[in-house]
Regions:
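Alpha-helical linker/hinge and terminal dimerization helices associated
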Residues: 24, 28-31, 67, 107-125, ...
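C-terminal regulatory/oligomerization modules of transcriptional regulators
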Residues: 1-9, 128-153
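N-terminal helix-turn-helix DNA-binding core of bacterial DNA-binding proteins
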Residues: 26-73, 84
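Charged, amphipathic alpha-helical coiled-coil/dimerization segments
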Residues: 79-139
Length: 153
C-alpha cells in the first residue's frame, strides 16, 4: 500500500509544492499540444522555435544559454524541428546556423494564442493583486534558483 508523504517527512502542502513544476509542465503540455497538434509538434518545441525566431542564425550552444535544457535535449529538439521542416541549418560542419522556415514561422505566430490559453486556463481565477504577488514571488524564486545553479557549476 502506498505510504503518505508524511511518512517521508513532508506535509501534503510541502509535497504539492515540490511537485508543482511537474504539474505545471504537464498542464502547459496539455494546452500547447492541443494547439500545435495539426502542425505535428509538441508544446516544448515552441520555446526553441521562439529563440530561433528572436535570434535568427543562432547555434545550438547559444540556445542553451536562453533555455534551461541540457545539451542533449536541445540537440534532440532541434533535430525534430529540422526533420519536421520547421527549421533549416545553413551552416556546414560542426557549427550550426538555425533559421525558421515558413512552417516554423507559422508555429511561432501561434504564441499569442498559447499565451491567451495559458492565461485563461491556469490563471483565469486569480485577481490582479494575486497575480502581481505570484509574479513577484516567482521573480525572487527564479533569482534564487539561478544563484544555486551558478554556484554549483
Amino acid at each position: 500500500m502506498p505510504r503518505s508523504m508524511d511518512d517521508y517527512g513532508f506535509t501534503q502542502v510541502e509535497a504539492d509544492t515540490l511537485y508543482f513544476p511537474k504539474k505545471m509542465t504537464q498542464v502547459l503540455a496539455i494546452i500547447g499540444d492541443k494547439l500545435f497538434a495539426d502542425l505535428g509538434i509538441k508544446s516544448y518545441h515552441l520555446s526553441v522555435l521562439r529563440v530561433i525566431y528572436d535570434h535568427d542564425g543562432i547555434d545550438q550552444k547559444s540556445i542553451r544559454k536562453v533555455i534551461p535544457f541540457d545539451k542533449s535535449r536541445i540537440s534532440v529538439v532541434v533535430r525534430e524541428l529540422l526533420d519536421g521542416g520547421f527549421v533549416v541549418d545553413s551552416a556546414s560542419g560542426r557549427s550550426s546556423s538555425l533559421h525558421l522556415t515558413e512552417k516554423g514561422q507559422e508555429a511561432v505566430a501561434r504564441t499569442p494564442e498559447f499565451k491567451r490559453l495559458v492565461s485563461e486556463d491556469i490563471f483565469g481565477d486569480f485577481t490582479e493583486d494575486e497575480l502581481k504577488f505570484m509574479n513577484e514571488s516567482f521573480v525572487r524564486l527564479n533569482k534564487r534558483l539561478n544563484e544555486i545553479i551558478e554556484s554549483n557549476q
